[in-house]
A protein has these predicted regions:
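Polar, glycine-rich mid-to-C-terminal structural blocks
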Residues: 407, 422-495, 499-502
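Function-dense linear segments that define catalytic or interfacial modules
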Residues: 247, 253, 260-278, 282, ...
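Catalytic alpha/beta core of large soluble enzyme barrels
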Residues: 217-220, 226, 231-239, 532-536, ...
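Internal maturation/activation junctions in enzymes
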Residues: 288, 330, 590-613, 639-721, ...
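Terminal amphipathic helices with adjacent charged low-complexity linkers/tails
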Residues: 80-85, 164-196, 428, 514-536, ...
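Short, surface-exposed, low-complexity cationic segments
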Residues: 14-32, 107-121, 263-270, 732-737
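Core nucleic-acid recognition elements
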Residues: 9, 36-263, 280-286
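Alpha-helix capping and helix-loop boundary segments enriched in small/acidic/polar residues
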Residues: 9-13, 33-36, 98, 102, ...
């Protein structure tokens, strides 16, 4: 028996549809009804259809359902059913109008699916049609009509109707897929393999994919693609992917689908795996990325699968105290910036203003003039005009040039001493905070590092903790050393004034960092990176010799350098708002996959400078972080300002840490440990002792690590994720949201931003960052830090009514709680720039 649909098409009769319609009418009134009574009414309708073949249309059947409900005395249900039919009819008419106006019949399927999935009145197609009508003009092209429809859906997004950002993404996805399909047909790209081959020949795809995978493997991998996962993307995320991440041809047309992008990244990151099980890892990585459970850092997301595969986010260099060394560091920065990386530079070894040079007294110009060169390099090397370079410059709080350094970005003072395009950061020892807490009026001595080395025979910056304190006090008491004496109150005033005015300097608590360093047997950590989440061993690059040699008849100058430790950050983030955080077994599996992927980045990466490659291969450091922190709390109805928050995240980060350590150890068993495992805190067990990991479960992990080793010297680092959190449709990094809803202006239109999964239930869980008591954020950071071997991009949010004392108290609390770094101090009246390199 066949039924005629409204559009004239014929389909096979299905009594289940009648049963569902009747059930929904009872659900709408909350009235109970037995299955037998529903079955009886379905039979009556069915009998009518059999007896009246001329009335076998959808409309006639629905009329009969109405009469059947009333015949059984279910008048309220019949009334709601009639209303439902009316609304459905309205929806159909609205969809027909949109499809007719846009002259795009295929669009009807998209809109009907949306209408089925979003049944609330606030997401009616009638509402969309009315908004769309206000943007249409006579004679509009199909392209412009679809643009107008997308704009209409975007502008309907409000706190009361947040799902319009998902609906607008559906229409945007439809438009994008249709354009790509048309392009594929023009080029004859009928399979994924043909497409990869074409993009490789065009220089859009790295040839290494075809060199490592057969045609059969690539086409099998293509079966992993699930187009339904496009529905997970909101408008902002999909728009960002289409504009900045998917591959475009040389005419600027998008040629790569979003799901193909995720698969291409997975194919690249799984390349080092054994051929036999490699496609399994491709699938696992693809699943994590396409489900938005994990985001790779911006360089990895953008450059994987491409010819220029620079996959690392941030780099850190120790600037030596020599002309050759300083200019080498500048060159290193320019190369890193050229390929889209961000930079951290430690200037604590460079002699201060008034220092000696080759015996000439008082002639050194200090660090500021070199930092101005760094600033100019950041502006000049602007990544093909895309954006200028980004760099944080670190200086110790006892360096003689500190007062001028603290005014680098402020608006007052001599402009010749300014560098407005770099980000200053200060390295603090425990002693400074102790003295600040005891008595702000105490004096603090500032020294030249070169003079200390020349007179005392040691480098103060090369030690930490009690040893540093002993040597610093020795310097204070040695009258042979010149110094600048300034009260701690004046230093704090300069720091806080700059923080409120510019958001910087960033904070690096050097003793806290180095005490927790699992690889202290191999070096010092002088500073962090651009976004303050990396903490790894550092050492300056040194020139050993310059020799003139003859090679193949040519005279060449050969410079020999000792490579030092040039830190590299390979980042990814777990999207906490999308993960089963309470299921430890599932978390172990997902963490193991992303740790493997990050470890493979080390082998696959293109390195802008050779020193970075050497350090990365020796330490094999990775930085697994998180995004969606506030999202995860809100969806579980956990308030930010609560002990429940601290307890929950303590458990979550312990779970992530344990999973990451086991994953790295299992990788070491399979592929070998990093070069310096012997003697590390991992090997001796000191890592576990320092963190109080003494449960039976942790003791098993400790034994496993001692037996198998560790593949990676450093594991966890929480980056800001400002861009990639938009892709994942979640909150950025560790930050609380600024607003539940706001409008962002982009190219003349207003883009709505909505807190993830905003609803009546989550609304009050999303308290604004500026309304949150910052002590809760600092305490939470301390709780997490125990489980993070590196550091966190943690911001402080202050309002105009904060006093300097209140801000200082937050710094002191962070130090006491064991927080390693503080990123921006975000004043409500201040807009600070985002780092995109570390956006994982």
């Amino acid at each position: 028996m066949n039924i005629t649909k409204r559009n004239g098409e014929v389909e096979v009769y299905n009594n289940e549809k009648i049963s569902i319609a009747i059930k929904k009418s009872f659900i709408s009134t909350g009235k109970d009804v037995s299955d037998s009574e529903i079955a009886g009414m379905v039979s009556e309708v069915e009998q009518f259809i059999k007896e009246n073949p001329e009335l076998r249309t959808v409309e006639d059947i629905q009329n009969r359902v109405e009469k059947c409900l009333m015949a059984h005395g279910h008048y309220d249900e019949a009334k709601n059913y009639i209303l439902f039919r009316y609304q459905r009819n309205e929806q159909r008419q609205a969809i027909n109008y949109i499809v007719w106006t846009a002259d795009d019949r295929e669009l009807a399927d998209v809109l009907h699916n949306v209408a089925r999935e979003y049944r609330e009145r606030s997401y009616s197609m009638v509402t969309l049609q009315e908004k769309f009508s206000s943007f249409t003009k006579p004679g509009m092209s199909q392209k412009d009509s679809i643009e107008a429809l997308i704009k209409a859906a975007v502008e309907l997004t409000t706190p009361e109707a947040p799902a319009w950002e998902m609906i607008s993404a559906r229409i945007l996805s439809y438009r994008s897929e249709k354009k790509i399909t048309r392009l594929e047909e023009e080029l004859g790209l009928k399979t994924f393999y043909r497409k990869v081959k074409y993009m490789t020949e065009e220089g859009l795809y790295g040839d290494y994919i075809l060199q490592n995978y057969s045609e059969e493997e690539i086409n099998e991998a293509a079966t992993f693609i699930d187009p339904e996962r496009n529905k997970l993307l909101n408008y902002s995320g999909l728009d960002l992917l289409l504009k900045r991440y998917v591959i475009k041809n040389y005419s600027g047309k998008v040629i790569e689908r979003v799901q193909e992008m995720f698969l291409g990244i997975a194919l690249h990151l799984a390349m080092p795996e054994e051929k036999e099980g490699r496609l399994m890892w491709v699938r696992r990585i693809y699943d994590l990325l396409s489900k938005l459970e994990v985001t790779m850092a911006t360089p990895t997301l953008s450059n994987s699968r491409k010819p220029s595969h620079q996959l690392s986010s941030c780099f850190i260099d120790t600037v030596p105290d020599s002309l050759d060394g300083i200019y080498r560091s500048l060159d290193n920065f320019s190369q890193v910036s050229k390929f889209g990386g961000g930079m951290g530079m430690y200037f604590g070894k460079v002699r201060a203003t008034g220092g000696n040079i080759r015996g000439f007294k008082g002639v050194a110009g200090g660090v500021i003039r070199w930092m101005r060169l760094v600033n100019d390099t950041a502006v000049a090397v602007d990544q093909l005009g895309m954006r200028q370079g980004a760099v944080a410059v670190y200086l110790d709080v006892w360096h003689k040039d500190l007062p001028e350094f603290l005014q680098l970005r402020t608006n007052n003072g001599d402009d010749r001493m300014k560098a407005h395009d770099i980000f200053p950061a200060i390295c603090y020892p425990d002693l400074f905070w102790k003295m600040a807490e005891e008595d702000m009026n105490q004096n603090w001595s500032l020294f030249c590092p070169n003079e200390i080395m020349r007179i005392k025979g040691y480098c103060l910056e090369d030690c930490y903790g009690e040893e540093w304190e002993r040597k610093y006090l020795d310097c204070v008491n040695d009258q042979r050393l010149s110094r600048r004496v300034i009260s701690i109150k004046d230093i704090v005033r300069l720091v806080l004034r700059s923080a409120v005015e510019t958001g910087t300097p960033f904070t690096f608590n050097r003793d806290t960092v180095n005490r927790a360093n699992p690889n202290a047997h191999k070096g010092m950590i002088y500073c962090s990176n651009l976004c303050t989440e990396i903490a790894q061993n550092m050492a300056p690059i040194e020139t050993v010799s310059k020799e003139v040699e003859t090679k193949d008849g040519d005279t060449v100058v050969v410079t020999t350098t000792r490579p030092g430790e040039f830190v590299v950050c390979n980042l990814a983030s777990l999207s906490l708002g999308r993960l089963p955080l309470e299921d430890e077994e599932k978390m172990k599996e997902k963490v193991a996959t992303v740790v493997r992927a990050l470890d493979n980045v080390i082998n696959l990466n293109f390195y802008p400078v050779p020193y970075a490659q050497l350090t990365n291969q020796r330490y094999r450091s990775i930085g697994l972080g998180i995004s969606g922190y506030h999202h995860a709390l809100a969806k579980r109805r956990i308030k930010w300002e609560s002990e429940e928050h601290l307890q929950f995240m303590d458990k979550v980060f312990e779970t992530i840490n344990r999973a990451a350590i086991l994953a790295s150890s299992n990788l070491a068993k399979e592929k070998g440990s990093y070069q310096f495992f012997e003697g590390s805190d991992w090997q001796t067990g000191a890592y576990f002792d320092k963190r109080g990991y003494d449960s039976a479960e942790w003791q098993d992990v400790r034994k496993t690590v001692a037996l198998q080793g560790m593949r990676n010297a450093y594991l966890l680092a929480v980056a800001p994720t400002s861009s990639t959190s938009i892709i994942a449709g979640t909150t950025a990094g560790l930050d609380p949201i600024m607003k539940r809803f706001f409008l962002e202006e982009k190219k003349g239109s207003m883009l709505p931003r909505v807190a993830p999964e905003l609803s009546d239930e989550t609304y009050w869980m999303y308290k604004s960052a500026y309304l949150i008591n910052q002590k809760w954020s600092v305490r939470a950071s301390g709780v997490r830090q125990r489980h993070i071997d590196q550091a966190q991009s943690m911001n402080l949010y202050i309002t105009n009514d904060f006093t300097m004392r209140q801000i200082l108290d937050l710094y002191l609390l962070a130090w006491k709680e064991g927080v390693k770094t503080i990123y921006y101090v975000r004043s409500k009246s201040l807009e600070v720039e985002e780092c995109e390199s570390c956006s994982s």
